[in-house]
């Protein structure tokens, strides 16, 4: 149900099980259609191709000052379309694209590499995020810190100008910094990097796939280099680089807002269990972009419950599970820009309630430093 946006989600063990939730979902929602999945991918690629063609064929013909209007529009529209492609590749990593794991991995590897994402590397770390959502010790990304671990300099950014600088930096650089340096990721006992097969993120049996992911990135980087030699680096940045920055920004924005909310609990190991962690997420409303992003934005709760479910069934499944989840389900329709500003202000660190002796393993966001 839709509650007051800052009214806390229940943190006690739910009075239902995952199997009880699954029983109310229509069985066809779990069916993965290779043809239907490819139809969404091809639709995204058609829009990407259209915007690319318009940019290279017609933008050079525009009289001054229309290029200054056309190029930003291209970057926005192309960035949104490529985010849709990114989501489909993410779905491949969940084995939600088709019934064939090999096809899923080939499609996911190709299109994530095209967007400079190490497919298998992120697939494995993201799988652990799904296995440990809401856990302070084991979740993989956007893990909130207790007040005692807040960096000393954060107090200088806990104001409107500081928050703006922090948000701009996070949206533009957060994704590549996470992949390369594990920024905002789970702390490890040594350096962690998605490009390093021997990183503590990965097990020994995953090393080969990490090498394959790196090869995909190197192949794409070499292709961009060759295009840059032929067309110039400025051409590459205008056509590909800036839309990619927008894709990365949307990825961080979407993920941050799915898991950061004043009403959501996080759990220490003494209290955490998988179902409560999976329910410690929130659906958001991005308007028309919900469809452009294949509803990864407004069906995230059901995605955490059933990650192999294809996106085109997630809306129906969400409506089906709402009566069972009751107050454990949260949809926040706050406009996205307002929401990210509120969350940056309200969700600074986590602490347990002072008067909750029996719930010391449950922590909530706080803002007062």
Curated annotation (Swiss-Prot):
Main location per the UniProt record: membrane
Motif (Histidine box-3) on chain: 300-304
CDD domains tied to this protein: Delta12-FADS-like
Keywords recorded for this protein, A-Z: Fatty acid biosynthesis, Fatty acid metabolism, Lipid biosynthesis, Lipid metabolism, Membrane, Oxidoreductase, Transmembrane, Transmembrane helix
Motif (Histidine box-1): 90-94
EC number per UniProt: 1.14.19.-
Source species, domain of life: Eukaryota
GO biological process, one term: unsaturated fatty acid biosynthetic process
GO molecular function: oxidoreductase activity, acting on paired donors, with oxidation of a pair of donors resulting in the reduction of molecular oxygen to two molecules of water
Motif Histidine box-2 per record, residues: 126-130
Top class in the EC scheme: oxidoreductase
InterPro entries on file: FA_desaturase_dom, FAS_N, Fatty_acid_desaturase
Signal peptide positions (record): none
Compartment(s) where it occurs, according to its Swiss-Prot or TrEMBL record: Membrane
Pathway linked to the protein: Lipid metabolism; polyunsaturated fatty acid biosynthesis
Membrane topology designation: Multi-pass membrane protein
Key word NADP present: no
Transmembrane domains' residue ranges: 41-61, 69-89, 102-122, 164-184, 207-227, 234-254
Pfam families per UniProt: DUF3474 (PF11960), FA_desaturase (PF00487)
Family indicated by similarity: Belongs to the fatty acid desaturase type 1 family.
Protein role: Delta(12)-fatty acid desaturase producing in a heterologous system linoleic acid (18:2(9Z,12Z)) and to a lower extent hexadecadienoic acid (16:2(9Z,12Z)).
Domain comment as written in the entry: The histidine box domains may contain the active site and/or be involved in metal ion binding.
Protein name (database record): Delta(12)-oleate desaturase
């Amino acid at each position: 149900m839709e509650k007051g946006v800052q009214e806390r989600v229940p943190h006690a063990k739910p009075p239902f099980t995952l199997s009880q939730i699954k029983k109310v979902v229509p069985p066809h929602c779990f069916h993965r259609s290779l043809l239907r999945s490819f139809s969404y991918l091809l639709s995204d690629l058609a829009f990407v191709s259209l915007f690319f063609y318009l940019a290279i064929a017609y933008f050079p013909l525009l009289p001054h000052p229309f290029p200054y209007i056309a190029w930003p529009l291209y970057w926005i529209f192309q960035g949104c379309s490529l985010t849709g492609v990114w989501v489909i590749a993410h779905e491949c990593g969940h084995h939600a694209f088709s019934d064939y794991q090999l096809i899923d991995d080939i499609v996911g590897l190709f299109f994530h590499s095209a967007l400079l994402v190490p497919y298998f590397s992120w697939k494995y770390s993201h799988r652990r995020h799904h296995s440990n959502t809401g856990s302070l010790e084991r979740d993989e990304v956007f893990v909130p810190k207790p007040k005692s671990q807040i960096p000393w300099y954060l107090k200088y950014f806990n104001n409107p100008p500081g928050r703006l600088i922090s948000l701009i930096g996070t949206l533009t650089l957060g994704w590549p910094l996470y992949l390369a340096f594990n920024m905002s990721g789970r702390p490890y006992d040594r350096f962690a990097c998605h490009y390093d097969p021997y990183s503590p993120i990965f097990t020994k049996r995953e090393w080969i796939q990490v090498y394959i992911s790196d090869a995909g990135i190197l192949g794409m980087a070499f292709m961009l280099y060759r295009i840059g030699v032929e067309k110039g680096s400025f051409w590459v940045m205008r056509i590909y680089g800036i839309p990619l920055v927008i894709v990365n920004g949307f990825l961080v924005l979407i993920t941050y807002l799915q898991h950061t909310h004043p009403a959501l609990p996080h759990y220490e190991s003494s209290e955490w269990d998988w179902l409560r962690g999976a329910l410690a997420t929130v659906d958001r409303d991005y308007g028309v972009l919900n469809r452009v992003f294949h509803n990864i934005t407004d069906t995230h709760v059901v995605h955490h419950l059933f990650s192999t479910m294809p996106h085109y069934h997630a809306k129906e499944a969400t409506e089906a599970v709402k009566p069972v989840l009751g107050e454990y389900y949260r949809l926040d329709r706050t406009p996205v820009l307002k929401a990210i500003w509120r969350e940056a202000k309200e969700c600074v660190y986590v602490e347990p309630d002072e008067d909750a002796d029996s719930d010391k393993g449950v922590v909530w966001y706080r803002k007062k430093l």
